[in-house]
Design a protein with these regions (language model features):
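Short, conserved, GDST-rich strand-edge loop motifs in beta-rich repeat architectures
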Residues: 53-65, 116-123, 176-188, 237-250, ...
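Beta-propeller blade signature
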Residues: 68-78, 124-136, 191-202, 248-264, ...
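Bacterial Sec-dependent N-terminal signal peptides
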Residues: 1-25
Length: 517
């Protein structure tokens, strides 16, 4: 495993914060070894008998080639019942293959595979499906697209072009359907091939999304599935000639398109005098919301939360709001109230409470580089450091107003594996939880704040931070690093009901951890 050092400094502004007892239970699996060092959890599903079915991806390193998936069935105590290894092997005619995602239907598990077939000169998307009892995988073709229609070949499903990702795969919240979008070659018209399948692999939508604007003027944001599984919502950020003439605010508009079997319909909305660099669509039964950060200065500065609500059928705009960060949030970050906007925020995820309130999470992320001269002459080399700084979390009411917004100040950086830093977040009831690795001591700061310190991510204590419905904090150490044979990768947590699953790793040694709230 690549060696690296991560530096962490977390400070929280909390009224009367102290370590508290947060109800939880912990179960660990036995420590085990894989042939491959690098592995991560990609799917967790309850088996209906208090056990769990886990899918892990693996990849070889510098001296061990190979890639594939481990399928593992555990009982309620994380005792292994059954396991199966599926190694991805390609024929000579299959190139540039990639597993887009994994989906389950009862006891059937499917790997959604996309590969370039050199004989057919086409990209072919297939489902590799098996029962979890016998692991006899059967291939079913879902669709194919001629290579001549694809914008570029080498970036497929990986690199970013003109704001769009070549391929996008998403599974809806209920895990009953999945959507795939593919950027199609057409420099004069923004074009995406859009597919919707249910978890039984039935094709629900096969649609050509077109927008009469040059490709570089359209930025794909995201796609989501309606609650009934029959419609798709595609959000784009569009730079039109009309918006270019705006005197204030972002010189663009957002366009939300509803796609069905019958075709597509689009609603346009503006950020007025504000800037909103990116938005996320969230689908409810009776409404659509688009949520993100906004600024009064420019894109990718952040003053607060922007909120748009639309009708899910007509797409009529019901309301729009711009909520500045609360005074408590600013004190969290700076220790005092001040007029300053944030920067470098990266969206991390959305959580929905039982009351359909939105918990919107982000993280301050950026990269720095350093050039090192060779002491013996002959040039030098660059090193890159990836920073995972402040966590931002805000809870949004049904009317679009902010219930609370909190800032978790921290300083994390790594030049290698980022799995042990950052965080995983979940909710239970109306409480929001963050799982983080921290250092030995909790230090008190001014203005009733605290700070967690850490110097090495390989020696980490696992902590949970809880935000209650009124926005107050409490925290608790769950695992001391001295009691662990392996450190746990807190950025790769997988959620299932009221439990969070982590995998720990030290060399080839691994262990699964289940935390139930």
């Amino acid at each position: 495993m690549k060696k690296f050092i991560a530096i962490l400094c977390i400070s929280l502004s909390i009224n009367g914060l102290q370590a508290q007892e947060i109800p939880n239970s912990i179960i660990k699996s036995e420590v085990f070894k894989d042939e491959y060092k690098h592995s991560s959890i990609v799917l967790v599903e309850d088996d209906g008998n208090d056990g769990v079915f886990i899918v892990r991806s693996y990849a070889g390193g510098l001296f061990s080639s190979g890639a594939g998936y481990y399928f593992e069935h555990y009982d309620s105590n994380l005792k292994l019942i059954k396991e199966y290894e599926y190694e991805m092997k390609r024929s000579e005619t299959e190139k540039q293959g990639s597993i887009l995602g994994v989906i389950m239907n009862g006891d059937q598990v499917s790997l959604i595979d996309l590969v370039y077939n050199t004989n057919d000169k086409a990209y072919v998307c297939s489902a590799l499906t098996s029962s979890i009892t016998d692991f006899n995988f059967v291939k079913k073709e879902l669709f194919r697209i001629s290579v001549n229609d694809i914008k570029k070949v080498h970036w497929f499903g990986a690199n970013q072009l003109d704001g769009d990702y070549g391929t996008n795969f998403m599974v809806n919240e209920d895990k009953t359907a999945f959507a795939i979008t593919i950027d199609i070659k057409d420099k004069d018209t923004e074009t995406h091939k859009v597919f919707l399948f249910d978890n039984k692999l039935n094709k629900k939508i096969d649609h050509d999304f077109k927008r009469d604007i040059k490709d570089k003027k359209f930025v794909y944001e995201n796609i989501d599935v309606s609650k009934d599984g029959n419609n798709l919502y595609l959000l784009g950020k569009v730079f039109t000639e009309e918006k270019k003439k705006k005197k204030e605010g972002g010189k663009y508009q957002y366009e939300l398109t509803r796609i069905s079997k019958e075709g597509q319909a689009t609603q346009v909305f503006d950020t007025d005098e504000h800037f909103s660099g990116s938005l996320k669509t969230i689908v409810f039964q009776d409404k659509l919301t688009c949520i993100g950060f906004y600024s009064d200065r420019k894109d990718y500065r952040f003053k607060g939360i922007s909120y748009f609500e639309l009708d899910p059928i007509s797409l009529a705009i019901r309301k729009s709001k711009y909520n500045p960060f609360t005074e408590q949030f600013i004190i969290d970050k700076y220790g005092k109230s001040k007029d300053k906007e944030l920067k470098n925020l990266s969206f991390r995820g959305v959580l929905i409470t039982e009351q359909n309130e939105i918990v919107f999470n982000a993280e301050e992320y950026y990269m720095t580089s350093n050039y090192h001269m060779n002491p013996n002459g002959g040039g030098g080399y660059w090193t890159y450091i990836y920073h995972y700084d402040d966590i931002v979390s805000a809870k949004i009411a049904n009317d679009g107003s902010i219930i609370w917004a909190r800032n978790i100040n921290k300083r994390q950086s790594t030049g290698g594996d980022d799995s042990y830093i950052s965080y995983t977040s979940t909710i239970k009831g109306n409480d929001t939880y963050f799982f983080i690795n921290t250092g030995e001591k909790v230090k008190k700061l001014s203005n009733d704040r605290i700070q967690f310190g850490q110097t090495s991510t390989k020696r980490s204590n696992l902590n949970v931070i809880r935000i209650t419905p009124d926005g107050n904090f409490s925290f608790q150490e769950i695992l001391d690093d001295k009691a662990n044979e392996v450190p746990f990768m807190v950025s790769d947590g997988a959620l299932s009901k009221n439990s969070v699953y982590f995998i720990g790793r030290k060399g080839k040694k691994k262990q699964l951890l289940k935390i139930t709230l």
